[in-house]
Amino acid sequence: MINSNFNYEDTRWQDLYMFLKNKGYEVYAPASKIGDCKRPYLVVKYNGLVPYQDFSSSIDNYSVMCYVPRDEYSKLDGFIRDVKASLKELEPLFKWRKIQTPSFYDESVQAHMVSIEYANYKKDS
């Protein structure tokens, strides 16, 4: 459950990014990490907006991409669990959509990656 002292940023993407950074994770915006993966890190990506049923609400979708170095695949599951446990603190602002991609080896950064999906429900303006 979200802490009543939570410091809101200007956007929900910034909230997610800063929360993870303040938790001690190495966090990047998409396409900003340069070089090979040497230690676990996260990339926070905005995945677009979808309408919420027939209500005057929408869902902003976000991916939290979890990376571990090529030779540390065995640490991927624990890293994902830790990230999900941390993000549970942001409910109901962000809800896990129960979507988690299979692991993917990203040769461009020499890392294994799994994406976990989160949603932010909001009233249309």
Regions found by a protein language model. Give the residues of each.
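Charged, amphipathic alpha-helical segments and their flanking helix caps
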Residues: 1-28, 46-125
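Short acidic low-complexity segments
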Residues: 28-36
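Beta-rich nucleic-acid/ligand-interaction surfaces
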Residues: 35-39, 106-109
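A short, hydrophobic beta-strand-centered structural micro-motif
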Residues: 38-47
